[in-house]
Amino acid sequence: MDKETIKAHKISDEEYAQILEILGREPNLLELGVISAMWSEHCSYKSSKKYLNGFPTKAPWVIQGPGENAGVIDIGQGMAAVFKVESHNHPSFIEPFAGAATGVGGILRDVFTMGARVVAGLNSLKFGDIHDEKCGKHQKYLVKGVVNGISHYGNCMGVPTIGGECAFDECFNGNILVNAFALGVCKSEDIFYAKAEGVGNPVIYVGSKTGRDGLGGAVMASDSFNEESKSLRPTVQIGDPFSEKLLMEACLELFKTDYIVGIQDMGAAGLTSSSFEMAGRSGSGMKLYLDKTPMRESGMTPYELMLSESQERMLICAKKGYEDKVIEIFKKWDLDAVVMGEVTNTGKMELFWHDELVGLIPIEPLSEKAPILSRPTSEPKYLSEIKNYKFELKSSVQELFIQMLQNENINNKAFIYDQFDSSVQTNTIKADGRLGASVIRIKENGASVAMAIECNSRLNYVNPKIGAALAVASAGRKVACTGAKPLAISDCLNYGNPQNPEVMWQFAQGCEGIKEACKELNTPVVSGNVSLYNETEGVSIYPSPTIVSVGVLEDANKTLKASFEKENLSVYLLGESLGEFSGSMVMKIQDKKVSGSLKELDYKAELALWDLLYKANQNSLLECANSVGIGGIAMTLAKMFAISSVGANLTSDFDDEKMIFDESASRAIIGLSKENEEAFLNLAKEFGVKAYKLGVSTSQKHFKLDSIELSKAELDKLYFESFKEQIQ
């Protein structure tokens, strides 16, 4: 094998030596391609696995933790929620519409593969500076393309996209982030797993035909960008949501039978990863007859068939004798279905082309025992330069308030979420635009499931460990503010180039923060994804661990809103304001800096707040609640009253007026009626949570907070109209 070919497959000299040892000979091109894909960062998690192994993954309500297509938790009365978040960053930067659309398609398949009907989608989007003279126009093009791709696929599939977050920073100028989350619901006893066992059991290919789209996608997603990357459009998969809709319905029909042993989505690295993962998990071997693959293009080679990432395809291990029944279901839905192999006990993948053996590879070294790297780490030098920066006001509070409310990181994103169908399936209780977590009703048990997606990259830049812990806490707090109990998380870890020791240090610290927060807050990790090499021309993104927290409220009718719908409601701030301006939005907007050093998270205070919100809501004491996030109480209150029908007369009583922009954790704003005040304050005392009265909601269409005064019309215009103008 010549060195150029090996290098083109991103295989290092050390890895090639391992390949020679595993095979006992030189690999052929097909084998090299398969091993390259399975050992890519995207499939093997070789740089990250050692840090992920420490995550807490168990709890009495966890049915399935990491290692399957998606995580599963018990949501009561025999029902389960199946969910996962993952990235489609690199393809979305190259081809925004197709990249984002297939990102949605992939995550939907991960969920319905487990036997669940998908009932909700969320997304976390990060773009570059839309005001930048050089790249602003291109960033707007990316925003429009990505949003169009997500809405097209989700809407056509009939899956409601009910929430998300969107942020802008120059660190994403060369690498945008597109993280998609899906949640499905099924009976706890009806979950299917990705396994291939039972010698002689048939392996069946189902779904769409295989083309040349997405070739090398897993390897591309395991590398950083440079000028040449702009020509990579052919490696972006093309999605067809209508085929996926048929595939989902066919799979859900199949799951009502007892015809199959296991099923796996063909995602990154296509047929390669699905076959190796199924056999690897089961300790089996497999024979695949590649010439039987349904092909969309003529003249395709075994190499292309094994590595194509054509969408809307699954691999099924059926029970022997039931092949025809399985095929019949997929034919009914107008999909391809063909027996293309069988399970063996050899522990090897045997690849045939017109009955000739063209590839023979041991499965375990490519799946369960793929190489794990221990990359060098070193603390980034920039941390010592930024840690002592202190924030002081340089303009009037009113000026800063207006500047912040119309900033694209804070203002309303109706331009985005209006493109998503959030009400299809008629289960949506609280969707995007209503602040905080999104909520759906579970008709089968009367409960609701709340979910929130969270990632503040600036905080992770300032302190990767505390920043990641804060993301877990913040996502959980948003769920708690709906009245639900946070139960588990899914994570999508977006970082730069792991070959840079400073990036690897950020990653290790981020994992430590997630591990600590999940343990202390009792929200285990049940699924996730790692996206590395988010780097262009040597510049890495800020560390960006996206966290989705999922919680349950036993009675959907008790779901809390985030808006004030009545006058004369008492407005309270819960939790302590500690003057946390490090990595804050106010610092970024006023000083154009991301600096400081974060305070450790007080987990006891965070948990006490969650417990208080849950108990107060169970006792019907609250009218509304919302987590205090970026921009502090100033922005939280502004947004709550912008989406409300009433005005506000509020006073913070802070000694220093800049404190209204403080971003301390473990805080929430609540609204409650005067007759419930005493009972609530007694409860807050019981839980050890400080409650500060800020004022009341009023019938006057006016917003007043300390020295800030605006008419409700001005407030609404700043919040609702700004982004539409900025994105044009």
UniProtKB/Swiss-Prot annotation:
Gene Ontology MF terms: ATP binding; magnesium ion binding; phosphoribosylformylglycinamidine synthase activity
Alphabetical keyword list: ATP-binding, Cytoplasm, Ligase, Magnesium, Metal-binding, Nucleotide-binding, Purine biosynthesis
Sites where the protein binds substrate: 87-90, 109, 237, 309-311, 531
Active site residues according to the UniProt entry: 42, 88 (proton acceptor)
GO cellular component, one term: cytoplasm
Enzyme Commission no: 6.3.5.3
Pathway info: Purine metabolism; IMP biosynthesis via de novo pathway; 5-amino-1-(5-phospho-D-ribosyl)imidazole from N(2)-formyl-N(1)-(5-phospho-D-ribosyl)glycinamide: step 1/2
Similarity comment text for this entry: Belongs to the FGAMS family.
Record-given protein name: Phosphoribosylformylglycinamidine synthase subunit PurL
Organism from which the protein derives: Campylobacter jejuni subsp. jejuni serotype O:23/36 (strain 81-176)
Gene that encodes the chain: purL
